[in-house]
C-alpha cells in the first residue's frame, strides 16, 4: 500500500493510513476542533447530523517549520480560509462525515472512518478518508494534493514527530495526482 489516493470511481478519492492506536486516541484528531486544527482545520463541530459548523484553515500553523505557499495560495495562506459545512454523520469513535465546500460552490462530502487494523495487541488503527461527490477531475487533483499533505501532517503528529512545513509536503505531490488521474 502506498500513500497515494485511489479513485474508486470518477467522483471519489480515497486515502488509507495506518496510525498508532488505540482508536480512542485518534478520534479527537478528527472531531475535536483544536486537535483537528493541528493537522487540518480548526473549529467546533456539532454532534447532531444536519447541523452546520465552520472550519478555519491556516496551513502555516500546522508546523513550526515554515515554507512559502505556492503563488495561487499566497492570499489564502496569509488570511486563512473559512468553510461552512454540515455534519452528515457522527458515530464516535468510528465514523465522522461532513459536507466540504462553501456556500458559493457545490458541496462535496468527506468521510473519516477509524477501524482496528490487524491484531488488537498491535495497537494499530486504519484511518480511511473518502472524499465523494467530486464534480470533476480538476477538483479531484486539487483535493488529493491537499489531503495528501494534511494526512502526512496527521501521521507525524500521531507518531509524536514534528511535521515539516505544510507547503513543503504539498509541493512533493504537485503534479503527481494530475499524472495519476490522467490514466
Where are the predicted features?
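Hydrophobic ligand-binding cavity/cleft-lining segments
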Residues: 1-52
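Intrinsic-disorder/low-complexity, polar/charged segments enriched in Ser/Thr/Lys/Arg/Asp/Glu/Gln
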Residues: 12-16, 52, 80-82, 95, ...
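Hydrophobic/aromatic beta-strand elements that line small-molecule binding cavities or substrate pockets
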Residues: 17, 43, 82-89, 101, ...
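A short, structured loop/turn motif at beta-sheet edges
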Residues: 23-24, 46-49, 88-93, 114-126
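Hydrophobic pocket/interface hotspot
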Residues: 26, 36, 53, 87, ...
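Glycine-rich portal/gate segments that line the openings of hydrophobic small-molecule binding cavities
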Residues: 45-99
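Beta-strand/loop substructures that line and gate deep hydrophobic ligand-binding cavities in soluble
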Residues: 99-156
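Short, highly charged C-terminal tails/helix-capping segments
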Residues: 158-183
Amino acid at each position: 500500500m502506498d500513500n497515494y489516493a485511489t479513485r474508486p470511481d470518477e467522483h471519489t478519492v480515497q486515502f488509507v493510513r495506518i496510525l498508532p492506536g488505540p482508536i480512542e486516541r485518534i478520534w479527537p484528531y478528527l472531531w475535536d476542533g483544536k486537535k483537528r486544527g493541528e493537522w487540518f482545520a480548526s473549529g467546533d463541530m456539532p454532534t447532531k447530523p444536519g447541523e452546520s459548523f465552520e472550519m478555519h484553515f491556516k496551513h502555516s500553523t500546522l508546523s513550526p517549520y515554515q515554507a512559502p505557499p505556492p503563488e495561487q495560495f499566497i492570499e489564502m495562506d496569509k488570511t486563512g480560509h473559512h468553510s461552512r459545512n454540515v455534519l452528515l454523520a457522527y458515530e464516535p469513535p468510528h465514523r465522522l462525515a461532513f459536507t466540504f465546500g462553501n456556500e458559493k460552490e457545490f458541496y462535496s462530502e468527506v468521510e473519516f472512518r477509524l477501524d482496528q487494523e490487524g491484531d488488537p495487541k498491535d495497537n494499530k488503527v486504519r484511518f480511511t478518508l473518502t472524499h465523494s461527490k467530486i464534480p470533476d477531475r480538476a477538483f479531484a487533483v486539487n483535493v488529493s494534493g491537499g489531503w495528501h499533505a494534511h494526512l502526512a501532517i496527521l501521521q507525524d503528529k500521531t507518531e509524536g514527530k514534528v511535521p515539516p512545513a505544510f507547503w513543503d509536503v504539498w509541493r512533493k505531490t504537485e503534479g503527481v495526482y494530475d499524472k495519476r488521474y490522467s490514466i
